Regions:
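Short, conserved phosphate-binding/catalytic loop or strand-edge motifs used
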Residues: 29, 47-50
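Cys/His-rich short segments
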Residues: 1-21
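DNA strand-break repair and replication-stress modules
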Residues: 6, 13, 35, 42-43, ...
Length: 190
């Protein structure tokens, strides 16, 4: 991949809909990449505060906030991590379907064309794209590093539903919040 593609992949991974790493906008990612602080998405989890101190616009406060945000991104659900990998043709909806079907990244890595095609809404183009992604040793290496960093790469088995489960209720979130409605919805339902 060329530099703009690599930067784009990191930007996608850090985005709100994927890993939601606060304080890591497109400009900052491009700067970190150009300065050699990060070369791929796995490098985000090995950033040291010292490596950021020399960079423009990085005071102690913003470094601390960024490191905290990267750390808290490790709690993102499997489908968000899967979406963040940037597999061609795998959007949010497909990532959710894959996570619910394969339950772990290892099951997905070891899947074949038939098992992928059996997933609702996955056609040949998406299935081949997934297989190609996991046949690339660089991608496998990155996934391994992300696993070692502690990201969630499996569906956490749901506890038995309690009688007051909210999943079949309509919940309206109104007002002003620090986090997005999407995040609030995620917290309520999970």
């Amino acid at each position: 991949y060329c530099d703009p593609q690599n930067i784009g992949r990191i930007q996608h991974f850090a985005s709100r809909k994927a890993m939601n790493i606060d304080g890591l906008g497109n400009e900052r990612i491009a700067l970190f990449y150009r300065q050699g602080v990060i070369k791929n998405i796995a490098d985000l989890y090995t950033i040291s505060p010292e490596s950021l101190q020399e960079l423009e616009g990085m005071g102690d406060k913003s470094i601390e906030k960024l490191i905290d945000s990267i750390e808290s991104s490790k709690n993102r659900l499997f489908h968000k991590v899967l979406f963040g990998l940037g597999i061609r043709h795998v959007g949010e909806t497909v990532a959710i379907k894959l996570a619910n079907t394969f339950k772990s990244i290892d099951e997905l890595i070891n899947s074949d064309i038939e098992s992928l095609l059996s997933v609702n809404e996955i056609g040949e183009k998406i299935a081949e794209s997934i297989l190609n992604y996991f046949q690339d040793s660089t991608n496998i290496s990155i996934v391994k590093k992300l696993k070692n960093a502690g990201l969630i790469f499996s569906i956490q088995e749901k506890k038995e539903r309690s009688p007051n489960s909210l999943s079949d209720k309509k919940i309206v979130v109104t007002g002003t919040f620090k986090s997005s409605r999407e995040e609030i919805k995620d917290k309520i339902l999970h």
